Design a protein with these regions (language model features):
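Acidic, small-polar-rich N-terminal luminal/periplasmic segments of exported/outer-membrane proteins
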Residues: 17, 43-183, 585
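Outer-membrane beta-barrel translocator/receptor signature
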Residues: 148-151, 162-240, 246-250, 310, ...
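Acidic/polar loop-and-plug regions of large Gram-negative outer-membrane beta-barrel proteins
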Residues: 221-226, 233, 238-317, 336-370, ...
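Structural signature of Gram-negative outer-membrane beta-barrels, strongest in the C-terminal barrel
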Residues: 243-245, 370, 389-393, 397-401, ...
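Face-selective signature of the C-terminal outer-membrane beta-barrel domain
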Residues: 312-333, 363-490
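Membrane-embedded beta-barrel scaffold of Gram-negative outer-membrane proteins
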Residues: 317-321, 325-331, 335-341, 541, ...
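Gram-negative outer-membrane beta-barrel transporters
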Residues: 595, 599-606, 623-712, 749, ...
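C-terminal beta-signal and adjacent terminal beta-strands/loops
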Residues: 642, 700-710, 732-779
Length: 779
């Protein structure tokens, strides 16, 4: 990290601490004492329990924020995990991937497909990058998300189009933002650590009268990635929300969020295929090339990644009575995912010259701004009809998304010269890459393609109390999903892009600009669940749910400027959405005076209707008959076993299979990519002394196949990430009732493991051991 950047972050940390104390000075909150004896500041998450302490010192169990959840979690016949702010803070998380490590069964895909160099979670083996929401509204565009403004993260698993509309079928993730409260408080954190780690945050909540409040969150951070040469980051963010009518029947919340993140992008290390293709010697069974963990193939003089986000939200809620509440949320957001990154798997096969393996650096590039305008209306409440109780929600969702995509040319004019017979520049030894190699050249951006997507969704939910012990949970949703794209036919020579004038002008009237036809899909999805309650705090359930994935997002990532048409004999046909269904049975219980929540479920997920080559011909014949299946068991635990002992985690077993693949596919019968058979996590803390808490996390993931089917990554040549076990350590010491120190040691054993691989180009090594020390002040 540069000295100037380190100096600026140190100044930010000092300013954060000073500003936080100044903001807090006139508005100290009275301390309240929770039932477990832990000193707590009103409305703040506490290290010793996973609920929220209200102004009366009572623990409120974490629950999803959306009115679509018409029943408490214990009575919801679905696998739903709520990761509260306490876990986010205690684990030292600063990314969505850090948070979701605590929810087994979720993996992250490598940088390929529709969301390269962006969050690409896989839930129950299904790519779910398009199924990330913020406060119930889909968060579009490629991003690597921050956590400083999060109150909790909510994960629903299984086919969930009833909740989310179009989706991948594996589940969805909702990020719940911090919101204004009527209790004054300020939280300030300042952290330092190994690998030039610096991070500072301020969370200030200021009541403005009896029913209004302003909440401001600030974040600045920088550092290097442990164990990865030259990989660093620098980011800052601000979130501000203003609320009026708090504690009354009518509330308005207006909020703004901004994030600016700059980093050196990392595409990991090559696979064995770099040294001669699929038939090359394979020294390691995984297929990952045995190079140093810190081997970095990018160029500091050329590569970069910038993410920016701006989001404006207006939320109005009015409660007419217990039977009727109306909520309307509008949002306008823009995101930009902009990068040039070296892909060690591109650039052709390496060559052995003079006893040294040499390779050319290939590049991946993207300029991807996205814009979203959304409005969601919910009408919800509780009513009784004929002695039967209903908890219902009716909703309307309207969205318009504009997604543009372009790439960069990176024509090198000088730099690291290639030895003969390789020619040109951008060469490096495979086993000794130097990110400080010089580079100069021409960088130009191509004309962008564009897609405009408009959706309308109508939905209804009802939790029906048939008796004191039996509940029926129903949901239905209709969606209209339509999109139209514009593509640009262009070529680049020596770094200069030229629109191809030979393409006839289309209705756009511009040569080379091709307006693709508007495509529209309508689909209806359902869920139904029956719940039996042996006690007030436990339940047994069985449920069924469906999901639909239009062909333009069949990869589970983002909308594309495509046609939605098939291949070969289906070239003139508009493909139908892929269909997913989930059957699930389970049990839930709140134990120990509702301090601890546990859940156990078993499920079968089936995804059908993917386009496949069924006869190689000639002529080649395609049909929508592809099918995958995932069967699994999940165990979850969250809360306090004793007032001093906190646990959060679970175990997932997934038995996945490609049931039907392409003609003569060698992958049929194999487990799916990014779907490890076993995964488990447990983060636990214990208050060993009145002011000292110790703990840590253990994370296990079994072998996970690479992210692509077929080719070098499929069949007998399957690339995979080997199993690993990672251990984190945690300690916290209360200096005073309002000040504490927190020590996090991530990957304490310095385990060398592969987080993920796309199975064709590269594999991503996990960061090495990293330690951080954070001072937390709460007023």
């Amino acid at each position: 990290m540069s000295d100037s950047r380190a100096s600026s972050l140190r100044a930010l940390l000092f300013a954060s601490s000073a500003a936080g104390m100044l903001v807090a000075a006139p508005a100290f909150a009275a301390d309240v004492t929770a039932d477990d004896g832990v000193i707590a500041t009103a409305d703040q998450q506490q290290p010793a329990n996973l609920g929220t302490i209200d102004v009366n010192g009572q623990v409120r169990k974490p629950a999803p924020h959306s009115p679509e959840y018409v029943a408490p979690l214990v009575d919801t016949p679905r696998s739903v995990t709520v990761i509260p702010q306490a876990i986010i803070e205690q684990t030292g998380a600063d990314s969505l991937q850090d948070i979701l490590r605590n929810s087994p069964g979720i993996t992250f895909g490598a940088g390929e497909g529709g969301q390269p160099l962006a969050d690409r979670p896989f839930i129950r083996g299904q790519s779910s990058g398009n199924n990330i929401f913020v406060d119930g509204i889909r968060d579009t565009g490629g991003q690597q998300r921050e956590v400083f403004n999060l109150e909790q993260v909510e994960v629903i698993k299984g086919a969930d189009s009833v909740y989310s509309g179009r989706g991948s079928g594996g589940g969805s993730i909702n990020l719940a933002s911090k919101s204004p409260k009527l209790t004054p408080f300020t939280s300030v954190s300042a952290g330092i650590g190994t690998d030039d780690y610096l991070r500072g945050t301020i969370d200030a909540n200021m009541p403005l009268g009896e029913t209004a409040a302003l909440r401001i969150n600030l974040m600045g951070a920088s550092g290097d990635v442990a164990g990865r040469n030259a990989v660093d980051y620098d980011k800052w963010g601000v979130a501000a929300s203003f609320a009026v009518g708090l504690g009354t029947d009518s509330t308005i919340v207006a909020s703004y969020y901004h994030l600016d993140s700059n980093q050196m992008p990392d595409y990991g290390i090559p696979l064995y295929t770099k040294l001669g293709g699929a038939t090359a010697p394979r020294p390691d069974a995984s297929g990952v090339l045995n190079v140093s963990r810190d081997a970095f193939y990018g160029l500091k003089a050329r590569d970069y990644l910038n993410n920016t986000v701006d989001s404006f939200t207006f939320d109005w809620t009015h409660r007419f009575s217990e039977a009727l509440t109306v909520r309307n949320v509008s949002r306008f957001s823009t995101t930009l995912n902009d990068y040039i990154v070296t892909n060690p798997g591109d650039g052709g096969s390496a060559q052995q010259i003079g006893g040294v393996w040499w390779m050319k650096r290939g590049t991946k590039t993207r300029w991807n701004p996205a814009q979203t305008l959304a409005n969601v209306t919910d009408v919800f409440g509780k009513i009784s009809t004929g002695g039967i109780k209903h908890s219902y929600d009716l909703g309307l969702e309207l969205t318009r998304e504009v997604n543009r995509n372009a790439s960069y040319s990176t024509f090198s004019t000088s730099g690291s010269a290639c030895p003969a017979p390789l020619t040109g520049f951008d060469c490096t030894p495979v086993f000794d890459p130097n990110p400080a190699d010089p580079w100069t050249g021409v960088i130009n951006r191509s004309a962008p393609s564009r897609s405009i997507t408009e959706t309308v969704g109508l939905y209804a939910f009802d939790s029906i109390s048939l008796t004191d012990r039996f509940l029926l949970n129903l949901g239905v949703r209709w969606d209209s999903y339509q999109t139209q794209g514009v593509s640009i036919n262009s070529t680049q020579t020596n770094g200069v892009w030229t629109i191809n004038p030979l393409i006839p002008a289309t209705p756009t009237g511009t040569p080379g600009v091709v307006a693709l036809p508007k495509r529209e899909w309508d689909f209806v999805n359902y869920q139904a669940g029956l719940v039996f309650k042996p006690t007030d705090y436990s339940s047994l359930y069985v449920s069924y749910a469906t999901a639909s994935t239009p062909p333009l997002i069949a990869g589970g990532d983002q909308n594309t400027a495509g046609t939605g048409q098939g291949s070969g004999n289906l070239a003139n046909d508009i493909l139908e959405p892929e269909d997913t269904e989930t059957y699930e049975v389970g049990a839930k219980a709140n134990l120990f005076n509702e301090r601890l929540s546990v859940g156990l479920s078993a499920y079968r997920l089936t995804r059908k209707n993917a386009q496949l080559l069924v006869d190689a011909g000639p002529p080649a014949t395609y049909a929508q008959v592809g099918e995958v299946e995932v069967k699994g068991v999940e165990l979850s635990v969250s809360g306090n076993i004793t007032p001093a002992w906190q646990v959060f985690g679970g175990y997932t077993h997934m038995d996945s299979e490609l049931v039907r693949g392409a003609s003569n596919s060698v992958n049929v019968g194999e487990s799916l990519a990014n779907t490890p058979k076993n995964s488990a996590s447990l983060f636990t803390t214990y208050r060993v002394l009145p002011r000292l808490t110790l703990g840590g996390g253990v994370y296990y993931v079994s072998r996970s196949n690479g992210g692509n089917q077929g080719g070098a990554g499929g069949g007998t040549n399957r690339i995979y990430a080997p199993e690993y076990t990672r251990v984190d350590a945690y300690a916290a010491y209360d200096l005073t009732d309002t000040a504490s120190l927190r020590l996090n040691v991530k990957n304490a054993g310095d385990e060398r493991y592969i987080m993920r691989t796309n199975g064709v180009h590269h594999a991503d090594p996990a960061p090495g051991r990293a330690a951080t020390l954070t001072l937390n002040l709460r007023f």
